[in-house]
Amino acid sequence: TLDRSSAASDVYKRQVVMEAERFATSVQEPGTQWTVIPDLGRTLSGLSLMPYTKPVSGASLTYQMRLKSDLSGVRVRLILDSTLPFIKGGHSYAIRLDDGEEQIENYNSDLTWANCYSKMYPAGAARVIESKVTFPGVTLEVGVHTLTIRPLSPAIVLHKIIVDCGGDMSGRLNLTESPRTRTLK
């Protein structure tokens, strides 16, 4: 279990920041592997299911966080590599908090030539895409919670996860990771 205390300091009272490689559990099918890409961009690393030529079915990453106060107004921000949509319709992932309803998010379908100046070029220059998913009506109570991410398309590269409950700290890559400890079982 990772201790991601939202009450550790004023900076983290309303959000939890996790590097992608700090997952609690990973699942992958035979012939695929979750691969850490060290020093990718301005984060600790990137994380992707490889090889990209294999199906992504059955793969997932689960993150754990221990909260010391109740948090509501949950919004998860995933910082992803700026992969252009080489798959018709773009790249998608599924995301779920605890045992709640899974949400499907397409994060790059609008990176097309029709949007080259407003969407595609800015994403390429920033080298990242910020994908936001809201969980209306969800309150995270004191204790351990899980966040599960399933790729629905190949070539998704995850940099950072930000569980934001009103902290609204600006920034993506420059946010310092929340304090953490690993408990070995």
Give the residues covered by each predicted segment.
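Single conserved hydrophobic/aromatic residue that forms the stacking wall/gate
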Residues: 1-8, 12
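Predominantly extracellular/luminal regions of secreted and cell-surface proteins
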Residues: 10-37
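Generic structural detector for well-ordered beta-strands
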Residues: 17, 22-24, 64-66, 137-139, ...
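A short beta-strand element within beta-rich, extracytoplasmic domains
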Residues: 23, 61, 67-91
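Short, surface-exposed polybasic-and-hydrophobic patches located at secondary-structure transitions
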Residues: 36-50, 173-185
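Short beta-strands within extracellular/lumenal beta-sheet-rich domains
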Residues: 44-69, 73, 135
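Beta-strand-rich ligand-recognition modules
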Residues: 56-58, 81-166
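Exposed low-complexity, polar/acidic, P/S/T/G-rich flexible segments that act as propeptides
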Residues: 155-184
